[in-house]
């Protein structure tokens, strides 16, 4: 059983037991505008399918330390594989706009993202059928959320690029079926999209030169999780790299 099949089963279990989300009280922010021409999206991720990332860094401390360097935050809410929690969203939202990152297969999860205060929601193209992914993205837009549609190959990226609207493509350097990471492949996909659609690059970013390369490919930003969880001080270097690139772009 590959990872996506396994995780889909856990999501179905969660949906049968989770309570209704709260009424939204946080202001809704245009996530793409918040990221700007090129921004760092810092992700709070306590664990991954490969194991624990870091448990001794509470969310409020992480967000407080990084908010000066990040344009937005990404919050993992999946509890079994990533030790995430919806309640991390309002903590992040106190500092910056928020992307809710989960394995979304149902409208109820988008409603939870909205209710807890997120401004954008991740939709993994390979997790659901094409029509379902489009339906979820459209529903997110109706609620005022920005859908970040994640792909890991050029064919899917070109397909999503035809959708229009406020959809942002997330190019994942990690293949979610094998969990292998290939940043070069992600950059190659980005080259095929340049100028056609807004996109960010996810996974595998850990060095300033990788941030600069993504920026020079006209990505709207990079999403960085594990590297910043292990070393939050890296955020200052990554932001400086982004600023250097924007000055040349």
Swiss-Prot record:
Q: What class of enzyme is it?
A: lyase
**Family annotation (SUPFAM superfamilies):** Ribulose-phoshate binding barrel (SSF51366)
- Which GO molecular function annotations are given, in alphabetical order? indole-3-glycerol-phosphate synthase activity; phosphoribosylanthranilate isomerase activity
Gene Ontology biological process terms, A to Z: L-tryptophan biosynthetic process
Is the Amino-acid biosynthesis keyword given for this protein? yes
InterPro entries in the record: Aldolase_TIM, Indole-3-glycerol_P_synth, Indole-3-glycerol_P_synth_dom, Indole-3-GlycerolPSynthase_CS, RibuloseP-bd_barrel
Pathway per the UniProt entry: Amino-acid biosynthesis; L-tryptophan biosynthesis; L-tryptophan from chorismate: step 4/5
Q: What are the UniProt keywords, alphabetically?
A: Amino-acid biosynthesis, Aromatic amino acid biosynthesis, Decarboxylase, Lyase, Tryptophan biosynthesis
Pfam families, per database record: IGPS
Q: Does the keyword Lyase apply?
A: yes
Q: Which reaction does it catalyse?
A: 1-(2-carboxyphenylamino)-1-deoxy-D-ribulose 5-phosphate + H(+) = (1S,2R)-1-C-(indol-3-yl)glycerol 3-phosphate + CO2 + H2O
> Might you give the EC number(s) for this enzyme?
4.1.1.48
Membership in a protein family: Belongs to the TrpC family.
HAMAP family with a match to the protein in the record: IGPS_A (MF_00134_A)
Q: What is this protein called?
A: Indole-3-glycerol phosphate synthase
Ranked from the top, the taxonomy reads: Archaea, Thermoproteota, Thermoprotei, Thermoproteales, Thermoproteaceae
């Amino acid at each position: 059983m590959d990872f996506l099949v396994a995780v889909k089963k856990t999501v179905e279990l969660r949906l049968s037991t989770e309570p209704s989300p709260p009424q939204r009280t946080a202001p809704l922010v245009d996530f793409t505008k918040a990221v700007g021409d090129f921004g760092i999206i810092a992700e709070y991720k306590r664990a991954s399918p490969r194991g624990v990332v870091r448990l001794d860094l509470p969310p409020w401390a992480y967000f407080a330390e990084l908010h000066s360097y990040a344009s937005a935050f990404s919050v993992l809410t999946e509890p079994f594989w990533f030790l995430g929690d919806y309640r991390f969203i309002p903590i992040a939202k106190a500092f910056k706009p928020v992307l809710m990152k989960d394995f979304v297969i149902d409208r109820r999860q988008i409603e939870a993202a909205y209710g807890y205060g997120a401004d954008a929601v991740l939709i993994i193209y390979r997790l659901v059928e094409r029509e379902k992914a489009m339906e979820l993205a459209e529903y997110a837009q109706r609620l005022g959320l920005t859908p970040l549609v994640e792909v890991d190959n050029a064919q899917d990226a070109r397909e999503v690029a035809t959708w229009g609207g406020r959809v942002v493509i997330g190019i994942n350097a990690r293949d979610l079926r094998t969990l292998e990471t290939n940043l070069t492949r992600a950059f190659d996909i980005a080259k095929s999209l340049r100028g056609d659609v807004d996109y960010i690059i996810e996974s595998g970013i850990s060095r300033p030169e990788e941030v600069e390369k993504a920026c020079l490919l006209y990505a709207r930003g990079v999403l960085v999780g594990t590297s910043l969880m292990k070393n939050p001080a890296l955020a200052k270097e990554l932001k400086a790299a982004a600023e250097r690139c924007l000055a040349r772009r």
